[in-house]
């Protein structure tokens, strides 16, 4: 409960005129408009204490149940190794970035870092994300072209085809395993990038003898 200040909304209470503090505001809004417990409560690591801890305590005291089933705290955003700050002159808005780069590249840059780790943003890294996207899309396009153009689509799978098919299955399983491990998007992308490398190698070595069904499965 915050004591009243001139010009602010205020209500009477046993503790004097004032208004709910930030922690109480959030707990009350979640309970009234979303219902408790909510599935996921997110926020930056700087909110873990005292804000989220107080939200949790208030919910347990008022409604005898947690405010959320899962709490996810993201790492801080850094700019070239320094905390993003207007005072340092290293502040970028999302609109400024999207005026120069595609949204998919921004998403990829974020996904390459685990959500609980600090994200070091730089335009060099964003340029790298653009190149990575082109590499992934190129591999998918090559796989689909090879699948459609293959003259060996009905042939019996050979050792190279089976090995590549296993690489596809292993990559899919590893992707899922990493995502199930605290939403480890960085590890999941590593599995995807490994499959891109395996795809390019397979297409180079198979030439015209690509197994269309395997190539199409990999592209999906």
What name fits each language-model region?
Residues 83-85, 90-220:
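Structural preference for alpha-helix termini/caps and helix-kink/transition segments
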Residues 1-146:
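Alpha-helical recognition segments enriched in aromatics with Gly/Pro capping
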């Amino acid at each position: 409960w915050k004591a009243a200040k001139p010009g602010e909304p205020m209500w009477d209470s046993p503790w004097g005129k004032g208004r709910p503090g930030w922690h109480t505001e959030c707990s009350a809004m979640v309970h009234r408009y979303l219902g408790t417990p909510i599935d996921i409560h997110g926020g930056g690591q700087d909110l873990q204490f005292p804000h989220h801890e107080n939200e949790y305590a208030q919910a347990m005291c008022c409604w005898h149940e947690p405010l959320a089933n899962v709490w996810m705290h993201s790492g801080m955003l850094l700019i070239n190794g320094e905390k993003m700050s207007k005072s340092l002159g290293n502040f970028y808005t999302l609109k400024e970035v999207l005026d120069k780069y595609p949204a998919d590249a921004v998403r990829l840059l974020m996904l390459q870092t685990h959500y609980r780790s600090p994200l070091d943003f730089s335009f060099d890294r964003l340029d790298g994300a653009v190149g990575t996207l082109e590499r992934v899309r190129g591999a998918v396009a090559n796989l689909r072209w090879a699948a459609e153009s293959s003259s060996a689509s009905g042939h019996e799978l050979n050792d190279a085809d089976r090995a590549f098919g296993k690489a596809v299955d292993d990559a899919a399983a590893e992707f899922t395993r990493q995502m199930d491990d605290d939403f480890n998007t960085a590890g999941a992308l590593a599995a995807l990038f490994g499959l891109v490398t395996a795809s390019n190698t397979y297409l180079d070595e198979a030439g015209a003898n690509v197994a269309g069904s395997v190539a199409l499965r990999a592209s999906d």
